[in-house]
Amino acid sequence: MESHRYEAMAKLADDTVLEAGAGLHRPRNVDWKRAAALLYGDWGTSKAYVIGLAFVAAGFSSLPIILAVCAVTGLVGVNYIVICRHFPDGGGVYSAARSQGRLLAVVGALLLVANLTVTAALSGWAALSYITSGAEHIAWIKLLRDHIALTTTVVLLFLGAINYFGPKHSGNLAIALAMPTVIVVLILIAVSVPHLTTKFLQPRHESLSALWVQFVGVILALSGAESIANLTGVMKLDPGSTPEHPSVARESLKAIAPVAVEVVLGTALLGWAMLSLPSVMGQTLHLTSPSAVSAALEARQQDMLRLIAEQFGTVTIAPWFGSVFSWIVGIVFFFLLLSASNTAIVAMIGLLYMMTRDGEMPRQFTRLNHHGVPSWPLLIAGGLPVAVVLIAADFNALVSLYAIGVVGAITVNVGSCSFNRTVEFTWYDRLLFAVTFLILGAVEITLARTKPDALFFIICVLGGGLALRAYTLKRHGLTTLTVTREVAAMVTPDLVSTMRPQLQEGQKIMVAARGPTPVLTYALEEAQLRKATLCVLYVREIAIFYGGGPPPPVRGRWQDNPEAAAIMSMMLKLGAERGISVLPVYAVSEDTSSTILDLAATMGVDYLILGASQRSAMAKLLRGSVATNVAQQLPDSIRLIIYG
C-alpha cells in the first residue's frame, strides 16, 4: 500500500518538477585552440617515454619502429578526424559503439577504463622520473626515486583526494602547459638538428615477426584520440550550423591536425636525435664504446628527453645551458604528465557514472558525496591505478599493460563505425575504418599473445565490469522502493487538492533548500506575510566530467531523492497548514549557481532567499560560494535575501 501511495504522489508531482537543462543544449564553449590544448595534454605526453622504450626494445635499429609508431598514430588521427565530423555530440567508443549494441559499448568502455587506469599510473610514474632524474645526490630525492612505486602511490592518492571536491577547472593545467611544452619541444629539436646523423643507425637484427612484436610493444601514442572524440559535444559549432543540426567538422579538424603533426614529426625527430647521441656523448661523458653508450641510454629510458636536452644543449651552447635546459624539460613534462594522470582519473569517474546512468552499472554508483562527486566511481578511479602501481614490478611492467586497453578501445570504435549504417559515412571512410580495424586488431591479438600480464589485466577488468553489469541487469525491476511511515502517512486520497499549486496573481518567493535549515521556516513566514506563492527549490549538484559528450539523461524527480523528498514533503505539509501555496521545484545540474539564477528568472520570482554558506574554507576555495556567485549575477528585478 505504501508503494502505491508513493507512486501516486510521484505522478501528481510530475507537473511541478523541473529538470536543469530540460529543452536546452549543453553549452558549446570549447574552441579549437582549447580543444587542441586538451588533446595535446594527453597525446603530447607519449613522446616522453615512447622513444626510450623503443631503444630498449631494438637499440640502434629502432628508428623503423619509431617511424611505424608515428605512421599508425597519424592513421588513427585521420580516423578520428572523420569520426569527429560525423559525431558532433561525442564520438568516443562508448557513444559510437552503442548504436551497434549495448554490450559492445560496455566492452569498449571497459577497455577504455583499463587504458585510463594504466595511463594514470604510468603518467604518475613517468612524471616522478622526469623531476627526480639528475638530483640523486640529494638524499630525500634519492629516497623518493629509490621507492618510486610508493611515491607514485602517494601522488595518485593525492590526486584522488583532490577529485573528492569535484573536477571543476580540471584540465586547466594541461591547457596552460600546452604552449610551453610545444616551445620546449621546438627548442629541443632545434639544438638536436645540427647533430642528427645516420652514422649510428643499424639494420634490423631480428626477423620480421620479431620486429612486429617489438613494434607492438611500444605503440603507446594512441590514447589521446579518444579524448578529442569525447570533446566534440562541447566544441563550438562550425559557422552556419545550429544546435538542432550541429557540425564541428572544421573546428575538430583545426584541433586535431596541428597536434597530430606535432606528435608524429616531434616523435620521429626526437627518436632520430636519441639515436644520434653517440656523436656527442664521447665529448660530454667520454663514452666511446657502443656498449657503454647503449647502457647509458637504457639507464635513462624513463626520462630520455632530459638526456637529449642535456647532451645536445651542452654541445650546442654550453654545459650550463645543457644542465638548465634539462631541468626545464624535466619540470615541464613533470607537470604535463601529472596533469595527464589527473585527467585520466577524472575521465574514468565520468565514464563509470555515464554507464551507471544508462543502467549498465549498479545503482549505488550514482550516490554522490557532499560535493556532487559519485563516491564509488571516485573510489574505483583512484584505487585501480594505485593497485596497478603496487602490483607492477617496475616501469616496464606498467608499459606492458598499457597498449592492450587503448588499442582495444580504438579497435572497437573504428570497427563499429565501419559497420554503422545509421551514419552517412562514404565508402572511402568505411575503407579507412576497415583498414585501421584490421591493423589494430592484429596489434591487439599480438599483445594478448605476447604479453600474458596484459592479457590477465584486461581479462580482470572485463570480467569484473561485465560481472557488475550482469548483476545490475538482474536487479533491474526487482528492487522495491521503501518509504518511511511518515512519508506514507502524508499520501492520502486528498493529496490531489493538497499538492495542486494554487497559483495566484501576486508575488512569488523562491527559497533554495539544501537541508531542513531555519531558512525554510523564514521563507514560510515571509510567504504567509506577503500572501505569496512559495517555490521551494532543491538542486542536486552532480560534479561529473562527461568527457565532452552530452550529459546522460537524468530523472528529475524529487521523490527519488530521499533528502529532497523529506524537505518537499515537510514544506507541502507546513504550507497546507498555513494556507500557503507551495510549489516544489527540483533540478539536477552541474552548476548550482547557474541553475538557481536560470530558474529564478524563468519563473519570474520577486524574492530569492538563500541560506548562508555552510561550506568549509577548503570547499569554498576549490568550488566557490553559491551565494556569492548568485549575488554577482542576479537581475536587479529580483531581490536577494541571505538568511543566517
For the regions a language model picked out, list residue spans one by one.
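Loop-to-transmembrane helix boundary motifs in multi-pass membrane proteins
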Residues: L103, R145-T153, K236-G266, Y353-L390, ...
